[in-house]
């Protein structure tokens, strides 16, 4: 055979000679893969695969390989050493240890190469992998040789197997060829020798290789099978041995008791190596006898015995689980815990002797009942036993039982738990160990919501203890103080029983304020308060309904109770109770006896209503009781039903349907007026209604099918209740069971719910079987005659069944006949009385419309809404009625407050706690501006206010207003239901209640609520239906009201609200025409699209014309209503709040009848008088107030909106388009932290920061430079605002996390500043707050970080979390520690500010000049170090200090003198002024005689709770006769506090050494000079001052608590606004993140509908939680005298003075209270300046107080610091003497009149022609009169 005949031989030879070294990387990788495959396949397969890949190379590839081969000659890897190959290819050789584990089991070259490749690359970095393949081959050959020498031949040899030698040329020991490119090269080089013998030898070699491989595989398989058999045998023997060992120990064999094959029992053969068992027959049919000896089943023989994993040996802890100490431990045999015998509770008295001992955790028994919830927890102290005696050798038992040393008692937690299915009487304390062992998830959930460090405190735990006589069960100590409400432990009634013997029963008890599903079974001998009375009532009710015999034990109980009360036996009582049946037609002249027995007395008109209802019953006429709200319709209807039952006319049952909010009120009235009624309240959740139906509907067992779904009753005999009280919703939900009952009578409260016959309530109630119907409504007609017809149709279907005929009948006849016939029709069915008719002694009510202006922000939003909705408004575009209604609602929201819009809400300034900033909140709403003034005056007058609004979001904003003003309030809206609603009403109506305001939603808060303790009603926004507003203000004007009620209806001028008011007039007119006799009128209809459009147009033309007027300039002469602005000044507000009756009766004989009904129905549309502010250039002229009742109807202009809005609309569209599209767009600058994570913000803002350091604010030496400095400052501030960019919230710079640009060092510095000086003040960026590490921060960044820091402090959540809610790391911040420090330092700073104006800034003024002179002579650097510059006070402080009035030790606090004001200035200022030096020269020159000590004032009102005042009293006895400096007393205490304010609070104690070394506080060194050298050391001084400071600190805290409790006349921040802020943040986040869902939902996306529904539910839950939190936030307020009492004038005198123009009056002062500093109020002190001063009244007071005016000196007005008084020397000296308390001092004239100083008189005379000063530049000047302390 030649090469031409078989080219594969050439291919093979070439491959064997040259290998694959010269191939490229890709080909070598393929060769390696094929080589691995070739190990498994035969040579022919490898040749086929090589031939398959050979065709791709072509001739080009062959030339390339040949060239490479000729270029580098590589030795044969299989005949060379690794050193030779490495030298040839230029690589560094690497030695390997082939005995290592990683080289074991290698069978091919690929695996071997992957192992050695990394090490070769490490020795030869950068080498091409293709160059290493020869080295891989030679290393693999060496590895094979090494393994063969070790006797471990490689099973699968890739290469190297040698063939026998033949006479032909030797063929290298290679494997089959793998590449075809070499064959093509060889075919071209045909000179090489070849023969057939070589090929045959090669074939034989390959066949031998295959045979060897097959043989090796077979040998390995046989060897493995033998090893498995040996392993099985060994496992079987081991299993048998283990089983024998168990049997020898006496343990039972764990074999199955059934046959593994047939699964039957019987005589079984047990396997000795597994749990299986077999019948002998099932093993082998021919087996007669079981095998002898050890036997294993077929499964064990085949698979071996089951491997049993041995459990690792248990190791106990090496320390005690309680004390964590070692030695003398008891090891538990059931778990890994270890304990000391003395750490167990109770401690062990002897060492356990048992072989096995279980620890307390393992022995804790699971309780019989499950825990329903954890109520509270507390600390429990567990003492340790006495320790071992010292020096005495103890036995081993004593060492185990007693601690080695004295150990303090340890604290463990105990939990107060409520057990499931048990009452609150069974609540008990359990250990924390029991909860951790058996209820771990419950306690983990509890710790998520509660603090694990401080036990919770409840209201009952901090209130005063009850007397033991009133609390025989000690319920407060056992239950109430741990979170259990008293009502939960009071029996409501017993609803069922079970008898076990003749005298043993269990009772099912329903508890007060708990639903029926929480009723519990109690034994009859349980020790429960009033249990026996409830048992007696239960059996007496069964006896009255079923004539069932009472058990003997209960009869004995009844006899015992009657005997204790002195009542006759029950038999005698029965005889007396037999009453004759009373004729139903009988009219009661006096109320019946059964009503009198209740203790109540009906009013004469209520008795008349009872007789009328009885009369209607006798005639079979269904009735409508339509008395006005507040006349007691509930009482009349209940007594009517009670009379039917008592007199035997009807036994019931009766059904009462009422709004859910009034259910509790119905229950109370029924309990009071109908004691024998069994009233069941059928409301609540599904589980509660299931229990109620089963136990309260019928005495017959099984009459009601059990289950969650209501079904028809099987029988209606023996009904259990007399009255079923339920809600409208339950009427619809459980119609099935309720409609199956035959009702004796139905009472529907607020029956106008039946005005629509298409409503579900109307239809369902019509299907009930009802014999008699009574409807209660205070507003029988709300909209039109159609609604009245539906009420009549519900009452009498037979008579009123055709609506069309009814309406046609009244439209065809004349007005007079129509009215007369309608009244005749209603007469038999309806009874209506008004308060004015029946309650002649009831206080009257006055109703006023209060017009207000839109604020600038509201005008902007109003115009924006109209412009944005141009398409909907434009008639040509065909706007629908629904779209117009949407626009109308948006405009109503704008009239209420712009913060109701999401965008305005997000942009609104907010406080740190998330609430709106008060000033902006009030300024941005015209209604709020007036509301603030009204509420302040109403609060001063002792009135209480109800505020109604339709929008619950508006109530949220009002809550922020109340918090800002410091008013306590309650709230009710649709989300507050049931008991929470009634609790809020009870709190507000309680005697002495502090709540000033009640916020209510018009619809939810206007039904069945009694708030007669309020005398002022403010309807913030009117309802479309005026009857809803009437329902609302009738909450106050009702029975029980003792004061005149004022109703104020806010209406925004020239807005949609004005037009809505006119619509309300039409509805009221219709009500009068139908229900009461009077004038005629047309039927009101629902507003059409045209009428709605007319409402929207109202006032828009004037609103948009303001822009044109502003463009024309101030010189425009255009006049009209639009040029006037309503101004509610003090005089107008006083007139508005005047409650004197000034109503004028309309004149004329013809108008008397008309006035009678118009005053009743339309009096709410009287317009309050107000002042208008004329624009400049207009003459003052009075304009008549014209009220438009009706106008001629004009055809609406179809082009109105186009003319008005089109220009604005197109302009807005153009601006919008500028922001979109291609090209440069208007971009909004937003700070995204992710974009600048790596920016170094400190470098970016370095320029601005340097400016802050170099040009920080310094007070100017004279007033001339102020304006220029302010201009420069404003310009600089504007430039920075434009240029500076805020750093991101979190960024990583140089490996450190920065928060708003603050690195860890700067954050630590800021924290240190907070802990040293407290909360950052407004001027913190210019004060000592700016420590060295923070000086490179700009003011903007500094304030932003301070705000973030304070927000984190107020954030709710446990301190254990790693981050705050916004992701900022906590870094170990302890909120309680920081807040406590801030509170303490604020008290210290406040106390120092209070007396700083009297005491100055130098403790020893006589050394001030000397110190300053030394400082001036020294170098600048030295002086700055030796003489610290006094702390600069903020600019606002001088103004604040004037209001900080205080009476201390009987001394009158006078304003600061000029000398004191100079002391308050910076120290460098007096050096350039002679005035400052003159008063100081005299003490310096006369140093020999002892200088007179300066006057001093200081006090802390701690109420005697500390020993501070007793110390002061003793010290002041000694500190006299010139020893004021040498003896430590209150003077030194004040300067110690002042030093803490300047130098701050140290890390562990105040920096007392710095304070001592400060010359300003030199007086602190004086007491130590006379003690001696030993006591003058700085450490001794510091320790003394530290103890003294702790005492003062305690006194300040107590003073603050007393101030809050007794005088509560300052707004305080709520204690816990963390949860509210968190929920508000969650609300904002959810609303923002789901903003696009609403759009997708409206577009028809079904998936978006589901998401939107879930989002709305989540928002609703968050809002409910927020409302509940806000209702519990504390806020305080002040009660001041009325305006008339303070001014000592009548209302008429005030009005006459105010209306008289006073040319000489000075400008009014601000009505706002001064912003600070903080005043410590004393008893009966009234703050001057809070009540506005009337300019017109100055002449009166100046004349009455002329003497006092002459004594005072003129007042100098200083810029931005208000007005200060400068008393003369006599006044200053007399201020130190305690004044005598007299009637003149305490009179109202002296405290409440405006300033009576001569300065006021002079300024009033000179300010006649001057420009009035702004309210901000003025401050009150007079001080309150003192009182002795």
UniProtKB/Swiss-Prot annotation:
Renumbered ranges of motif DEAH box: 749-752
Region (Disordered): 1-81, 147-198, 1168-1198, 1234-1289, 1415-1495, 1745-1829
Record bears the keyword Zinc: yes
Pfam annotation, one family: PHD
Gene disruption: observed consequences: Larval arrest, protruding vulva, sterile progeny.
Compositionally biased spans, kind Acidic residues: 1-17, 25-39, 1177-1186, 1749-1773, 1819-1829
Signal peptide: none
Protein task: Part of a NuRD (Nucleosome Remodeling and Deacetylase) complex which is implicated in the synMuv B pathway that negatively regulates specification of vulval cell fate. This negative regulation is thought to be mediated via interaction with the promoter of lin-39, a key regulator in vulva development, and is dependent on the presence lin-1. Contributes to negative regulation of lag-2 which is expressed in the gut during larval development. Has a broad role in development.
Description of how the protein assembles with itself and partners: Component of the MEC (MEP-1-containing complex) complex that contains let-418, mep-1 and hda-1. Component of a NURD complex that contains let-418, hda-1, lin-40 and lin-53. Interacts with lin-1. Interacts with pie-1. Interacts with akir-1.
Name of this protein: Protein let-418
């Amino acid at each position: 055979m030649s090469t031409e005949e078989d080219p594969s031989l050439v291919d093979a030879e070439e491959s064997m000679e040259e290998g694959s070294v010269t191939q490229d990387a890709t080909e070598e990788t393929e060769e390696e893969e094929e080589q691995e495959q070739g190990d498994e396949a035969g040579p022919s397969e490898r040749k086929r695969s090589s031939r398959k890949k050979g065709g791709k190379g072509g001739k080009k590839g062959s030339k390339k390989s040949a060239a490479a081969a000729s270029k580098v000659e590589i030795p044969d890897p299989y005949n060379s050493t690794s050193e030779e190959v490495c030298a040839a290819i230029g690589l560094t050789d690497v030695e390997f240890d082939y005995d290592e584990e990683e080289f074991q089991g290698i069978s091919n070259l690929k695996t071997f190469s992957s192992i050695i490749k990394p090490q070769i690359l490490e020795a030869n970095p950068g080498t091409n992998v293709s160059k290493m393949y020869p080295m891989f081959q030679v290393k693999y050959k060496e590895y094979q040789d090494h393994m063969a020498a070790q006797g471990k031949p490689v099973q699968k040899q890739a290469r190297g197997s040698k063939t026998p030698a033949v006479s032909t040329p030797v063929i290298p020991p290679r494997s089959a060829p793998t590449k075809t490119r070499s064959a093509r090269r060889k075919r071209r080089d045909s000179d090489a020798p070849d023969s057939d013998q070589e090929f045959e030898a090669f074939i034989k070699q390959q066949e031998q290789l295959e045979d060897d491989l097959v043989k090796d595989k077979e040998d390995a398989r046989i060897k493995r099978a033998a090893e498995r058999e040996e392993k099985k045998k060994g496992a079987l023997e081991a299993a048998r041995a283990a089983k024998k060992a168990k049997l020898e120990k006496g343990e039972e064999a764990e074999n199955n008791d059934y046959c593994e094959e047939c699964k039957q029992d019987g005589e079984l053969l047990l396997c000795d190596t597994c749990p299986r068992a077999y019948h002998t027959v099932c093993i082998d049919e021919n087996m007669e006898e079981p095998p002898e000896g050890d036997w294993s089943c077929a499964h064990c023989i085949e698979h071996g015995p089951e491997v049993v994993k041995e459990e690792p040996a248990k190791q106990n802890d090496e320390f005690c689980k309680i004390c964590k100490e070692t030695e003398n431990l008891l090891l538990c045999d059931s778990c890994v815990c270890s304990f000391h015998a003395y750490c167990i509770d109770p401690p062990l008295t002897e060492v356990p002797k048992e072989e096995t001992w279980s620890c307390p955790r393992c022995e804790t028994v699971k309780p019989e009942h499950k825990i329903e919830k954890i109520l509270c927890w507390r600390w429990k102290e567990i003492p340790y036993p006495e320790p071992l005696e010292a020096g005495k050798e103890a036995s081993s038992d004593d060492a185990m039982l007693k601690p080695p040393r004295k150990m303090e008692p340890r604290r463990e937690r105990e939990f107060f738990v409520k057990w499931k299915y048990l009452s609150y009487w069974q609540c008990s304390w359990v250990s924390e160990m029991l909860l951790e062992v058996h209820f771990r998830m419950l306690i983990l959930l509890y710790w998520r919501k509660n603090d694990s460090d401080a036990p919770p405190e409840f209201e009952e735990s901090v209130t005063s203890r009850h007397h033991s006589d009133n609390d025989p069960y000690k319920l407060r100590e056992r239950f109430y103080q741990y979170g259990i409400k008293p009502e939960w432990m009071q029996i409501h009634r017993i609803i069922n029983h079970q008898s076990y013997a003749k005298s043993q029963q269990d009772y099912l008890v329903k508890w007060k304020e708990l639903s029926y599903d929480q009723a519990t079974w109690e034994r009859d001998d349980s020790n429960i308060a009033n249990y026996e009375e409830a048992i007696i009532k239960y059996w007496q009710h069964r006896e009255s309904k079923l004539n069932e015999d009472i058990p003997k034990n209960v009869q004995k109980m009844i006899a015992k109770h009657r005997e204790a009360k002195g009542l006759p036996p029950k038999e005698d009582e029965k005889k007396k109770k037999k009453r004759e049946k009373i004729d139903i037609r009988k009219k009661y002249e006096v109320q019946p006896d059964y009503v009198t027995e209740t203790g109540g007395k009906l009013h004469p008109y209520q008795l008349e209503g009872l007789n009328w209802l009885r009369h209607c019953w006798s005639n079979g006429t269904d009735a409508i009781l339509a008395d006005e709200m507040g006349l007691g319709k509930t009482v009349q209807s209940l007594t009517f039903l009670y009379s039917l039952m008592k007199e035997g006319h009807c036994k019931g049952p009766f059904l009462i349907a009422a709004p859910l909010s009034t259910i509790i009120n119905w229950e109370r009235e029924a309990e009071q007026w109908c004691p024998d009624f069994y009233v069941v309240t059928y409301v609540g959740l599904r589980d509660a209604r299931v229990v109620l139906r089963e136990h309260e509907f019928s005495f017959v067992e099984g009459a009601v099918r059990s289950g969650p779904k209501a079904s028809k009753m099987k029988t209606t005999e023996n009904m259990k209740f007399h009255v079923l009280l339920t809600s409208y919703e339950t009427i619809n939900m459980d119609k099935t069971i309720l409609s199956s009952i035959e009702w004796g009578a139905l009472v529907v409260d607020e029956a106008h719910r039946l005005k629509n016959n298409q409503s579900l309530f109307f239809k369902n109630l019509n299907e009930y079987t009802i014999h008699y119907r009574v409807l209660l409504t205070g507003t029988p007609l709300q909209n039109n005659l159609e609604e009245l017809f539906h009420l009549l149709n519900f009452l009498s279907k037979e008579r009123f069944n055709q609506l069309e005929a009814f309406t046609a009948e009244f439209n065809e006849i004349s007005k007079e006949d129509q009215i007369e016939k309608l009244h005749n029709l209603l007469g038999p069915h309806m009874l209506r009385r008004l308060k004015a008719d029946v309650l002649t002694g009831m206080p009257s009510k006055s109703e006023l419309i209060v017009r207000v202006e839109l604020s600038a922000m509201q005008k902007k939003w109003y115009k924006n809404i109209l412009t944005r909705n141009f398409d909907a408004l434009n008639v040509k575009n065909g706007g629908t009625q629904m779209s117009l209604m949407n626009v109308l609602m948006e405009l109503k929201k704008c009239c209420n407050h712009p913060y109701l819009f999401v965008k305005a809400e997000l942009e609104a300034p907010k406080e740190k706690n998330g609430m709106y900033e008060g000033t902006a909140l009030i300024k941005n709403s015209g209604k709020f501006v007036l509301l603030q003034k009204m509420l302040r005056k109403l609060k001063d007058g002792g009135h209480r206010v109800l505020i109604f609004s339709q929008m619950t979001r508006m109530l949220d904003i009002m809550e922020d207003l109340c918090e800002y003003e410091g008013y306590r309030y309650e709230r009710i809206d649709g989300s507050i239901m049931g008991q929470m609603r009634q609790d809020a009403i009870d709190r507000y109506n309680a005697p002495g209640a502090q709540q000033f305001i009640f916020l209510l939603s018009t619809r939810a808060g206007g039904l069945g609520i009694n708030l007669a303790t309020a005398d002022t009603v403010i309807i913030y926004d009117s309802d479309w239906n005026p009857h809803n507003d009437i329902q609302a203000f009738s909450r106050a004007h009702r029975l029980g009201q003792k004061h005149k009620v004022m109703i104020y209806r806010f209406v925004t001028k020239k807005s949609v609200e004005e037009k809505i008011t006119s619509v309300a007039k039409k509805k009221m007119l219709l009500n009068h025409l139908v229900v009461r006799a009077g004038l005629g009128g047309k039927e009101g209809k629902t507003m059409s699209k045209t009428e709605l459009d007319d409402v929207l147009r109202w006032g828009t033309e004037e609103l948009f014309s303001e822009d044109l007027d502003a463009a024309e300039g101030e010189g425009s002469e255009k006049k009209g209503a639009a040029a006037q602005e309503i101004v509610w000044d003090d005089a107008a507000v006083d007139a508005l709040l005047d409650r004197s009756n000034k109503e004028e009766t309309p004149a004329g004989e013809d108008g008397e009848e008309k006035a009678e009904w118009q005053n009743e129905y339309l009096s709410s549309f009287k317009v309050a008088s107000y002042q208008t502010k004329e624009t400049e250039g207009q003459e003052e002229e009075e304009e008549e107030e014209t009220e438009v009742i009706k106008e001629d109807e004009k055809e609406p202009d179809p082009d109105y909106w186009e003319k008005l809005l089109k220009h604005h609309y197109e302009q807005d569209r153009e601006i919008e388009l500028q922001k979109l599209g291609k090209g440069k767009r208007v971009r909004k600058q937003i700070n995204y932290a992710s974009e600048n994570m790596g920016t170094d913000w400190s470098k970016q803002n370095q320029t601005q920061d340097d400016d802050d350091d170099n040009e920080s604010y310094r007070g100017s030496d004279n007033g001339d430079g102020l304006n220029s400095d302010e201009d420069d400052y404003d310009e600089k501030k504007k430039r920075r605002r434009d240029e500076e960019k805020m750093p991101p919230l979190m960024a990583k710079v140089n490996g450190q996390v920065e928060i708003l640009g603050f690195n860890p060092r700067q954050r630590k510095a800021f924290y240190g500043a907070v802990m040293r000086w407290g909360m950052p003040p407004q001027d913190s960026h210019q004060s000592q707050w700016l420590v060295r590490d923070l000086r490179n921060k700009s003011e903007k960044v500094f304030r932003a970080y301070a705000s973030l820091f304070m927000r984190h402090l107020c954030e709710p959540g446990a301190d254990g979390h790693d981050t705050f809610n916004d992701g900022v790391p906590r870094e170990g911040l302890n909120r309680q520690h920081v807040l406590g420090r801030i509170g303490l330092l604020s008290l210290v700073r406040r106390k120092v500010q209070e007396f700083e104006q009297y005491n100055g800034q130098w403790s020893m003024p006589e050394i001030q000049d000397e110190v300053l002179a030394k400082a001036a002579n020294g170098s600048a650097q030295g002086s700055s170090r030796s003489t610290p510059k006094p702390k600069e006070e903020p600019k606002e402080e001088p103004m604040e200090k004037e209001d900080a009035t205080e009476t201390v030790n009987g001394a009158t606090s006078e304003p600061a003198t000029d000398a004191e004001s100079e002391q308050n200035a910076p120290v460098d200022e007096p050096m350039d002024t002679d005035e400052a030096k003159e008063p100081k020269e005299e003490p310096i020159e006369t140093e020999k005689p002892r200088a007179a000590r300066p006057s001093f004032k200081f006090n802390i009102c701690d109420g005697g709770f500390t020993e501070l005042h007793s110390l002061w009293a003793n010290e002041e006895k000694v500190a006299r006769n010139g020893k004021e400096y040498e003896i430590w007393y209150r003077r030194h205490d004040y300067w110690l506090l002042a030093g803490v304010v300047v130098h701050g609070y140290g890390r562990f104690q105040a920096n007392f050494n710095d304070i001592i070394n400060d010359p300003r506080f030199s007086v602190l060194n004086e007491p130590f000079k006379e003690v001696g050298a030993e006591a003058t050391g700085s450490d001794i001084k510091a320790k003394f001052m530290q103890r003294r400071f702790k005492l003062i600190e305690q006194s300040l805290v107590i003073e603050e608590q007393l101030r809050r409790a007794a005088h509560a006349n300052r707004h305080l921040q709520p204690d816990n606004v963390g949860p509210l802020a968190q929920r508000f943040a969650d609300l904002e986040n959810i609303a923002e993140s789901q903003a696009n869902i609403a759009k997708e939902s409206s577009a028809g996306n079904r998936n978006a509908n589901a998401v939107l529904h879930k989002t709305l539910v989540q928002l609703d839950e968050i809002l409910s939680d927020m409302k509940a939190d806000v209702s519990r936030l504390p806020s305080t307020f002040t009660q001041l005298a009325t305006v008339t009492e303070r001014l000592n004038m009548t209302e008429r005198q005030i009005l006459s003075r105010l209306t008289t123009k006073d040319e000489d009056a000075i400008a009014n002062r601000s009505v706002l209270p001064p912003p600070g500093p903080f005043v410590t109020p004393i008893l009966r002190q009234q703050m001057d300046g809070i009540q506005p001063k009337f300019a017109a009244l100055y002449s009166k007071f100046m004349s009455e107080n002329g003497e006092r005016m002459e004594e005072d000196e003129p007042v100098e007005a200083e810029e931005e610091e208000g007005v200060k008084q400068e008393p003369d020397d006599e006044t200053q000296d007399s201020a130190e003497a305690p004044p005598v308390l007299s009637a003149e001092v305490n009179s109202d004239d002296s405290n409440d009149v405006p300033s009576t100083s001569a300065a006021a008189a002079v300024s009033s005379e000179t300010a006649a022609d001057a420009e009035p000063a702004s309210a901000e530049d003025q401050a009150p000047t007079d001080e309150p009169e003192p009182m002795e302390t």
